[in-house]
Amino acid sequence: MGKKSNITHQCLKELNKQKKFGESKFEAKQAARKAGRNSATVRGIYSTVTFNSYVRVCKQFIAETITNHKNVKTFADCKKYVPEFLQDKEDKGLSAWTLAQYGSALASAYDCQKNDFGYDYPVRHRANIKRCRGVNSSDYRSPEERWDTAKMVLKATGCRRTEALRLRKEDFREATNGNLEVFKRGKGGIERWCLVNPKYTGELREYLKTAETHPVSGENRLFLKAQLPQSSIHDMRADYARDLYQYFEDRGDVATGKIYHCKGDMLGRSFDKGILSAVSYNLQHSRDNVVVNHYLWK
């Protein structure tokens, strides 16, 4: 076995130790809080998407380190070159979010925290996000008619791509107040019933009456990969978030009167914390600032 293959094997062996597929990261963090521990210390890789992403980062790191430092013999030898690798990626223009992901990937492989490498990660600013920026409405994205049904379901449910691909007819139910609810199977093992965007309740009901299903992994699912727009669907989740905020604001029974005041380039804007929490819950998030900075910023 060559040096590169040997070091890669050592790395993958460490990454495999972090696998916690089928477990819930959300529940693990809750358990940590109840035990009086910092939830940020919860370790493990809870999804195959994250695992595969981390593998790609680690393989890239190993390949570049071996090329630049012929003296390394083991994966442990490579660790001191992590700051150099990350700095090189920063110099080449990788975003602060991507650099943080790279750090998390390598931290998982080395069973440490990403800040333990001694690299000074750049600060993440909302204004620097490029995904879906310059798009005023998801109606202008993937305008082809063939995406109309998928876009309607995405804006109705607020699903991430992986969540949408796992939707079944039985994942929808009538709520007591006349709305619809959707069962989302999301990141980190979070599974919950969420509100369907009331703007699309009638249209979604009609769709579900005749919707075709496809056998995937022993389930009858509503969408195949090819039936969802290939471009980012984040802006459709943003549409969902903004519609839900307006819905809860109009309803009047969710607002708490406690105000979230925006900072930075959103200085002067404010949102009710009770409504933010409700929107965050239905997006399968857990932090109000994420909802504001990534979904309600327009």
Cite the ranges covered by each PLM segment.
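DNA breakage-rejoining catalytic core of tyrosine-based enzymes
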Residues: 117-144, 188-199, 219
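A short, glycine-centered helix-capping/turn motif at helix boundaries
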Residues: 153-166, 243, 247-252, 283-286
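Conserved tyrosine-mediated DNA breakage-rejoining catalytic core shared by Y-recombinases
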Residues: 166-203
